[in-house]
Amino acid sequence: MKTKEAVELLAALAQETRLSIFRALVQAGPEGLAAGRIAEAVATPASTLSFHLKELSSAGLVRSRQDGRFIYYSADYAAMNELVTFLGEKCCVGASGAAGCAPKAQLNKQRSGA
């Protein structure tokens, strides 16, 4: 991932309602949620929700699919994982005692000897 792409993804998430929507979709899993369920989950009117879903979709963080009368939205896990990897890929490369900034799961593995 290039820095410009990361900035676009982070900009899309840098708004409270959009971040709440994205987190709800991440929690829902790959099947996603219908727009009405998202609106309920984040207590947002349909017109406002539509705007935010469009922003998240344009950034590449959310996918949509039609199923009958309903549109289901889901998080794009590949994009999310790519962003997380980008953010942490050079974590502490220049620091001594790098274990202090390693992700928690990695620290737990190191402590258990796995």
How would you describe each model-predicted region?
Residues 1-5, 26-27, 77-114:
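Amphipathic alpha-helical dimerization/coiled-coil segments
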Residues 4-5, 9-45, 67-79:
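N-terminal helix-turn-helix DNA-binding core of bacterial DNA-binding proteins
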Residues 18, 51-52:
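Histidine-centered divalent metal-coordination motifs
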Residues 40, 57-58:
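Alpha-helical residues within the helix-turn-helix
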Residues 45-46, 52:
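Short coil turns linking two alpha-helices in DNA-binding domains
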Residues 49, 56, 73:
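Divalent metal-coordination and catalytic microenvironments
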